[in-house]
C-alpha cells in the first residue's frame, strides 16, 4: 500500500490580476516578529485583492543579533536578498539603513513595524491597500499604473 500526500493550493487570483509577492520576517511563522537582519525565517506569500496563499519559507542559519552585531567578514544580508528575489514588499520589525538601501536597489520596498502582529493581519492590511489606492510604485509593479493625461487641461475651448 502506498500513500501520496499533496498540498492542495487555494484558488489563485482572478485572470489578469497580478499577485504581489510579500515577504514577512518571522521567528514562529505565525507572526511578524523579527528584525530583518536577525530573522532566521522569512515567509513569502502571494497576495491579491481577494485572497492570499503561502508560497515558501526561507530559513537562515546565520543571522545578526538583535543589536545588529555580526562578523564583519560574513555577509548575512546578501543571501536573504537573493532568496527574496521577486518580492515587492518586505515586512520586518526593523531594517538597518544599509540593508534597506540594498533592498531598494534590489527592487524591494522595506516596511518596518513597531510591534509584532499576526501574519494574517499583515496580509489583510496589504489586501485593504490593494483594494483601495495603492501607492504609485505598487501600481507600477501591478501593471495598473496609468500616467496622468493632462492634455484635456490644455485644449482650447471652442466658442
Swiss-Prot record:
Any single biological process term in GO: nitrogen fixation
A GO molecular-function descriptor: metal cluster binding
Matching InterPro entries:
Di-Nase_FeMo-co_biosynth (IPR003731), DiNase_FeMo-co_biosyn_sf (IPR036105), NifX (IPR013480), NifX-like (IPR034169), NifX/NifY_domain (IPR051840)
* Entry keyword set: Nitrogen fixation
Give one Pfam hit by family name.
Nitro_FeMo-Co
* Top-level taxon of origin: Bacteria
Free-text function comment from the UniProt entry: May play a role in the processing of the iron-molybdenum cofactor.
User: What protein family is recorded?
Assistant: Belongs to the NifX/NifY family.
The protein's name in its UniProt record: Protein NifX
Annotated organism of origin: Rhodobacter capsulatus
Q: Which gene encodes it?
A: nifX
